[in-house]
C-alpha cells in the first residue's frame, strides 16, 4: 500500500518535473519512524520513550494508533501522570461535542511516536474548542491554558489536521438538550454528579429569567433543604439565583413546568452559582432517594470528572 | 661514575613531569568506556581508564554508581564543547583524556573551567539519576521546608541535589586529596574551582510547577525543586570563566592561600574561578602551550561575536568554499501515522581561517 502510494507520488513528481521542463531537485519520498535520539523538545533526564498505549488509558486507547511518546506534549513524564490528568477529560469525550475531540486531546496526551513531535494544527484546536468550550463553560470550566490554540502551529503539512470533522452528517441535526438537563438514572450516576458538584439542594423554583445566553433560576423563599452545603453559607441560601450557562436556547424538559420541588446541583465559581444538574424531585424514585441518603458515603475520586453526562459513546 | 648523571637526569625529568600532572579531570576518560564493559562486577573497576586508586576503590564499593558516572563524563565533554564552540579555544582537547595537552595540564583559565564543569556535571548527573530511578541507592530529593506558595503544593520528584553533591565530590575530588601529587598551589586551585562548579549547580536549583487541576486547570499546581539543564549550568560557568581571576600562592598567617595577583587586598571569592598561569591567544598552533591554533577552523562572516571571521582567524584572513548539503524537505505527516520527506540538495557557502 505504502509502496504503491509512493510510486504514484514519485510518478507525479516526475510528470510535474517534465512539465516544468527541468528535472525536479526533490527525489523519491523517504519514510521516517521512531528514532531514539530526540531532535527537539525538552527531555528531562531521559530521551523520549515509545510505549504501547495502555488499556487503562481509555481516553486514547481507541484513538487509531497503538504507541505513544513519553514525555507527551503536555510535559507529563510518567504513564501514571498521563492517566491521572487524562481521566478528567473522559466525560467531555462522552459528550461528543466535536467529532475530532479524541484526535485533538490524544495528539497531546498520547502523541504518535515519530522522529519529531507532531503537534495538532491550530485549526484542529479551534474546531475542538468551538465545539466543546461552550459545554465546559456551562459547568464553570474555562478552556484551559494548556490547550490555548495559539500554542499550536498554523496549518501545515507536519501537523495533525481535522480528521473527521469534514464528514457529512448522517442524520439531520436535532436541537440538543441542555447539558445540565441530561438525566442520570442510576444512583451511582447521581452520586458521581454530586461528587463533581460543590453543593446539592432540594428547592422550589419561583421563576426563570433569560440573561444574555444564560438562563437564571430564581429560587422560591420557602421549602428549601441544603443536602450538601459545600461552599454555601446560610446567607447564600436565603436568595438562591442559579445560572444555567449557555442555557438560554436549548430545551430542558425538567423546567417546562415549575410546580413541585427540584433536586439541584451546582458549583460556586467566582461568586456566581452555576447549575450543573437539575432533576424533578420524585419521592417515589428509589434511585434518587438512595443517592441522597448515601451521598457522603460514596467514594468520590480525588480527581473527579468535572461533570458526568448521561450520553454514552456508541 | 659516568652512569650517575644519566640517573640524575631521569629523576629530574620525572619530577618535572610529576609536578604538573592534573589527576583531577583524568576520570573524564570514562567517556570512552566501551558499552561491552557491563560494570556489574568489581573486577571491571581495574579496567577503567583515568582513575586514581581512591576512585577505583569507590568504584568497587559503589558499583551501581559507575554507569551514571560514565554518563557524566560524556555529558561533561559534550557540554564543554557546546559551550565553547564559538571560541578559539573550543575544548576540543578534552577528547584527549586522560593524556591532556598543556592547555588543561597547566593551571590555566581553561583548566579552571573544565574542573568546575566536571564537578558540576557529575553531581548534576547523579542527582538526576536519583530522580529517574536509575540509581537504587537514592530516591527523590526532600520536600522543602518552606511553603510552596498560594494555590501550590509540593509533589512530583525533586532532584536529589544533596546526594549528587556528596557522591559527586567524593569521586571527582579524590585525586586532589592524595597528598603526594602535585604542588599545593595547583591542588588548592583545582579544589576551589571544583567547588565553584558545585556552587553554580546549587544556584541552579529552582522551583518548577505544573498545572494538575481538573481538566487542565491551574486550580491545583504541583511544584518540585528541579535543577536547570546542564547546558545552562555550563553557560553560567562560561560567564565565570570570562571573568576569572589570576591568583598567586602567598603566605597569609601560618598558611599559604590563593590571593588575587593584581588586587591582593581581598580574598578570593567563593563564586569566582581562579587560575595560576595565563593562557596564550590560541591563534597559532603551539604544542608548548597546548594551542591547536585556528587554521582551518570554520568562522562566521556575518557575526560580531567571538566566532566572527576577524576574531576567530586573528586577522589572518579566511577562505570561502562551497559545500553541498543534503537535507530533508517537503515533509508531510499522514494520518495515521507516518511522515514522508523528500531529499533536497543545496549549496552553502562556508568560511575557514587561513
UniProtKB/Swiss-Prot annotation, chain A:
Transmembrane ranges?
none
Classification via PROSITE patterns: FZ, NTR
Q: Which UniProt keywords apply?
A: Developmental protein, Differentiation, Disulfide bond, Secreted, Signal, Wnt signaling pathway
Entry GO terms, CC? extracellular region
- The cysteines joined by S-S bonds are 50-113, 60-106, 97-132, 121-159, 125-149, 178-250, 181-252, 195-300
Give the signal peptide range.
Answer: 1-21
- According to the entry, every stretch annotated as the NTR domain falls at 178-300
Cited SMART domains = C345C (SM00643), FRI (SM00063)
* Entry annotated with the keyword Disulfide bond: yes
The subcellular localization recorded is:
Secreted
Its domain description in UniProt is: The FZ domain is involved in binding with Wnt ligands.
Protein task: Soluble frizzled-related proteins (sFRPS) function as modulators of Wnt signaling through direct interaction with Wnts. They have a role in regulating cell growth and differentiation in specific cell types. SFRP5 may be involved in determining the polarity of photoreceptor, and perhaps, other cells in the retina.
The UniProt entry's sequence similarity note says: Belongs to the secreted frizzled-related protein (sFRP) family.
What name does this protein carry? Secreted frizzled-related protein 5
The organism is Mus musculus (Mouse)
Swiss-Prot record, chain B:
Q: Which residues form the signal peptide?
A: 1-24
Cystine pairings recorded for this chain: 80-91, 130-138, 140-157, 209-223, 211-218, 283-314, 299-309, 313-353, 329-344, 331-341, 336-337
Identify this protein by name.
Answer: Protein Wnt-11
Residues with lipidation of kind O-palmitoleoyl serine? 215
Q: A Pfam family in this protein?
A: wnt
UniProt gene name: Wnt11
Keywords of the record, alphabetical order, are:
Developmental protein, Disulfide bond, Extracellular matrix, Glycoprotein, Lipoprotein, Secreted, Signal, Wnt signaling pathway
**Which PROSITE patterns has this protein been placed in?**
WNT1
Q: Where are the transmembrane segments?
A: none
Origin organism of this chain?
Mus musculus (Mouse)
Q: What is its main location?
A: secreted
Q: How is it modified after translation?
A: Palmitoleoylation is required for efficient binding to frizzled receptors. Depalmitoleoylation leads to Wnt signaling pathway inhibition.
Similarity comment: Belongs to the Wnt family.
**Purpose:** Ligand for members of the frizzled family of seven transmembrane receptors. Probable developmental protein. May be a signaling molecule which affects the development of discrete regions of tissues. Is likely to signal over only few cell diameters.
